[in-house]
Amino acid sequence: MNIQIHRGQNQIGGNIIEISTETTKIVLDVGLELDDDKNQELPDIDGLFDFAGYDAVFISHYHGDHLGLAYYVHKDIPIFIGEDSYKIISASDNYKNIETFKPKGFLNHKKSITVGDITVTPYLCDHSAFDSYMLLCEADGEKVLYTGDFRSNGRKPYNWLLKELPKNIDALLCEGTTLSREGYVSQTESELEQEAVELFKTNTGPVFVLQSSMNIDRIVTMYRAAKRTSRIFLEELYMAEITSAIGGSIPNPYFSDVYTFITNPKRYETLSQYDHKVGKDFISKSHFVMCVRNSMLSYLKSLSEKMSFKNGLLVYSFWSGYKENDEMKEFLNECENLGLKIVTLHTSGHADETAIKELIGTVKPKKLIPIHTENAERFKELVPDVVVEIEDCN
């Protein structure tokens, strides 16, 4: 079994990994590069975009740096992805009037899929993207495990995953996003929730949370904090469409204490399907936590004319690097001008050093290939007894 990393070893994001035998070729993830513009050219990989030269594509999760090029994969190449992942990306695309790619099938925990002479087994893992998977590839008597993106600090028990994973594998392709941050230790979502509770109690005014509408764990965290401080939870229509697509125990518009609102009147027809739909009059008289996006500045200004933002709070719950974005800077500055106190509450969607070492110690690879990292050399220090393969392949 051969491994070729077309992209993603000495950088964060943009993963495209080829696994092949003499008769079968598959790809694990087809990601956009994080630092490129939206008009980036397709990678020059024969048979992936121009014709059907591969037997399948497997997508670990729905973040753009792992899935973004799936829309351009040749239509005759089957794509596999988690079912809830697909529901989320479909809801997002539908809201934006984008046509979603059609998968051949769905990934499920420990349900193997055989393509040619390669068998792929997904393992459900925790990440800031809901329904993420590690992928075990087996062929020619060898086992290769691709971690995708993972963490130990979410709401899924990490020990459960470690018990489920295969042992004594031939090669581990392991992400190391956080290895550039020396001494970094991930805060848990539960710890984040408790911090949010204290903030929501201390700041008696309205609370706005700036976070990704696709970060389901963070939605759960903020919903639980709202519930514990007797605040209603407000989801703008885009988030509501995503959470309702998953349903179940995820806070969604069908919960009695979750309310949905719109910032664009043209969206009212879509909003009307939900029972708990509200407007500014209701919101202005309520004690709430509202999830917002940085495109909602004019809406917040309009809302501030109907209610006081005194003792109000804006919780910034993204990676800190996004604060350098011009649009984000403007949004945060204007929120301060509206009288909101800005507080950062965020934790990484990626494993810290301790979690990475635990994983490596559990699966016991013969060799380790770093991916999704800007500090691949750190793996040699973390696990000196494991062969670490680093190639300049970008």
Regions of interest found by a model, annotated:
Residues V185-N311, I371:
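Hard-cation-handling environments
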Residues D76-I79, I98-L107, V120, P253-F261, ...:
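Active-site regions of enzymes building and remodeling cell-envelope glycoconjugates
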Residues D36, Y86-S90, D217, A240-A245, ...:
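Short, charged/polar "capping" segments at the starts of alpha-helices
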Residues M1-F58, G64-D217, T221-R224, R228, ...:
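His/Asp/Glu-rich metal-coordinating catalytic cores
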Residues N10-Q11, H63-D65, D126-F130, S152, ...:
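Gly/Ser/Thr-rich loops at beta-strand to alpha-helix junctions
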Residues D29, G82, T147, E175, ...:
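Generic beta-strand/beta-sheet core signal
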Residues G31, T177-E182, Y238-S249, H346-A355:
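Short connector loops at secondary-structure junctions
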Residues Q11, R228, P265-N394:
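C-terminal regulatory/interaction regions
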